Regions:
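Long, compositionally biased charged/polar stretches
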Residues: 1-228
Length: 228
């Protein structure tokens, strides 16, 4: 309050009633959008021409006592060039908009998306799994007078200091950010990070590869993040 005297404003894209559909196309969560036809295991309630945000990767990871486990599948249909939420599939039950259980299921799906994007993909995979080894290798392998090492040295040192802080403040230990803010204890967070590092492929960040692999090449909806 001392630094920022006004609360953050809600982006206009997220003021619509169908927040899940807006996030699926106009936020970093669009990274998880895919055609339901690409799912290896597709629940009966999910049609092949649907689009999904599949967070079943959290299945099998127990939540902390008193917490509900994040996860589920956001199911969206293409209608008149836009995505609209059909429901959230969770633990064998399809929760439709307007049903008493839909809001809870949607929140748990959003919790899963947020946990995966921040703790697993951003911090563990990118900061620690990719950027840190690149910085260390560049510093250790190239000679001190190499032009590339000299050019990158200030950025690499800042990267290593920052990622050291990421590891200790956000991931390592039971009092770290990932274990206190989100739904899983430290041991479970470590197990999820191991799986995320083993399964991630950096090629998925290439737009052409990603749209083909996720069945989005001919998607009948506008995908601003991929276009950008």
């Amino acid at each position: 309050h001392e630094v920022w005297d006004t609360p953050p404003a809600m982006p206009p894209e997220l003021t619509a009633d169908d927040v899940l559909a807006a996030l699926a196309v106009s936020s970093p969560f669009s990274l998880y959008l895919r055609s339901a036809a690409t799912l290896l295991v597709r629940p009966d309630e999910v049609e092949a021409d649907d689009y999904v945000l599949d967070m079943r990767l959290f299945d099998g990871y127990p939540a902390k006592p008193g917490f509900l486990a994040p996860g589920g599948i956001g199911v969206l249909a293409a209608v008149d060039g836009e995505l609209r939420t059909r429901g959230v599939w969770r633990e064998g039950v399809f929760h439709e908009p307007g049903s008493p259980t839909f809001e809870s299921a949607r929140r748990l799906l959003l919790c899963a998306l947020n946990t995966h994007l921040t703790t697993l993909l951003h911090n563990a995979v990118m900061h620690l799994g990719y950027v840190t080894p690149f910085s260390v290798a560049t510093t250790n392998v190239l000679p001190p007078d190499h032009p590339l090492r000299r050019l990158l040295h200030p950025a690499l040192q800042t990267t290593l200091v920052g990622n050291y802080q990421v590891a200790h403040l956000q991931i390592l230990g039971s009092r770290a950010f990932a274990s206190t803010v989100f739904s899983h204890d430290h041991a479970t967070v470590m197990a999820m990070i191991d799986e995320a590092l083993a399964s991630f492929r950096v090629a998925h960040f290439d737009p052409d590869h990603r749209t083909a692999a996720d069945g989005l090449v001919d998607a009948p909806v506008d995908l601003p993040l991929l276009r950008d």
